[in-house]
A protein has these predicted regions:
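Generic structural hydrophobic/aromatic packing signal, biased to beta-strands
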Residues: 7, 17, 32, 42, ...
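Conserved NTP-handling cores and scaffolds of large molecular machines
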Residues: 65, 86-93, 104, 111, ...
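Conserved NTPase motor "head" modules and their coupling/switch loops across ABC/AAA+ ATPases, GTPases
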Residues: 117-203
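Nucleotide-state sensing region of NTPase/ATPase domains
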Residues: 3-77, 83-89, 152-156
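Short, surface-exposed, charged/polar-biased interaction segments
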Residues: 28, 74-75, 92, 99-106, ...
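A structural signal for short hydrophobic/aromatic patches embedded in well-ordered alpha helices
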Residues: 81-82, 167
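Helical mechanochemical/support elements of P-loop NTPase systems and associated helical scaffolds
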Residues: 3, 13, 50, 67, ...
Length: 203
C-alpha cells in the first residue's frame, strides 16, 4: 500500500502539506509535515496534535477509479447502479427485474427457434416484456429525479456554486417525464420495429 513518505518529491528531504477547511462555520488551518525517517507531524491551528484528534475533522468525498465507470462506460453499468440502489429501498423491484429477464430470455428463445407455431406467440411475450419494461423504466426515472435533487445541491455546495450537474434518463419514449403506461407503449412499438433486426442477430 501507499506510504506517507510517497508524498515526498524525489530528491527532497521532506514535504509540507497545508490546507484550510471549515468546521462548524469556523475556518481551521491544518498542516502535515512528513520527513523520511521521522514521525509525521500534524498541526491544527498552529498546535501539534495526534492523528486521532483529526479523525472526522475534514469531511471529504472520495472518488475511486471504478466510480468513473458510471460516466465512461456504457448505459448497462448505469442501469445496474440504479437497479441496485432501488432494490435496497423497494425490495419488490428485484422481483420485477427477474421477471423481465425471464420474459426477455423466452422472447429470444422464440426468435432463435424460427418455428412458425412458436413465433405466433411472440406478440404475447412482447406485451409482457413491454409492461414490465415500462414499470422498470418509470421506476428508474422517478428514482433518478429524486436522486438529482440531492446530487445537484451537493455539487453546488462543494464547488461553491462554480459547477452544475445534471442527468437525464433516456428511454424509448424520448420524454423526460412519463408514466409507466407511456413507457410500456413506447417499448412495445420499439419491439415491433426491431423485430427483423432481432431475428437476424439471434438466428
Amino acid at each position: 500500500g501507499a506510504k506517507d513518505t510517497d508524498f515526498i518529491k524525489q530528491g527532497s528531504l521532506f514535504t509540507d502539506i497545508k490546507c484550510v477547511f471549515e468546521k462548524s462555520d469556523r475556518k481551521v488551518k491544518g498542516e502535515i509535515k512528513i520527513a523520511d525517517g521521522r514521525r509525521k507531524e500534524i498541526i491544527k491551528d498552529g498546535v501539534k496534535v495526534r492523528s486521532a484528534e483529526m479523525v472526522g475533522q475534514i469531511n471529504t468525498v472520495l472518488f475511486y477509479p471504478e466510480h468513473l465507470s458510471l460516466i465512461k462506460s456504457g448505459p448497462e453499468i448505469r442501469r445496474k447502479f440504479l437497479d441496485t440502489a432501488i432494490c435496497q429501498i423497494k425490495p419488490g423491484f428485484f422481483r420485477i427485474l427477474n421477471e423481465y429477464s425471464k420474459v426477455l430470455a423466452q422472447r429470444n428463445f422464440l426468435l432463435k427457434s424460427q418455428r412458425k407455431d412458436m413465433l405466433e406467440t411472440l406478440d404475447s411475450w412482447d406485451i409482457k416484456l413491454a409492461k414490465l419494461g415500462g414499470i422498470i423504466t418509470n421506476t428508474r426515472k422517478t428514482y433518478l429525479e429524486k436522486l438529482l435533487v440531492f446530487a445537484e445541491k451537493t455539487v453546488d455546495e462543494i464547488s461553491s456554486g462554480k459547477e452544475k450537474m445534471t442527468a437525464e434518463y433516456q428511454s424509448y419514449s424520448g420524454k423526460k417525464t412519463t408514466s409507466a403506461e407511456e413507457e410500456e407503449k413506447a417499448l412495445y412499438n420499439k419491439l415491433k420495429e426491431s423485430f427483423s433486426e432481432d431475428e437476424r442477430l439471434l438466428c
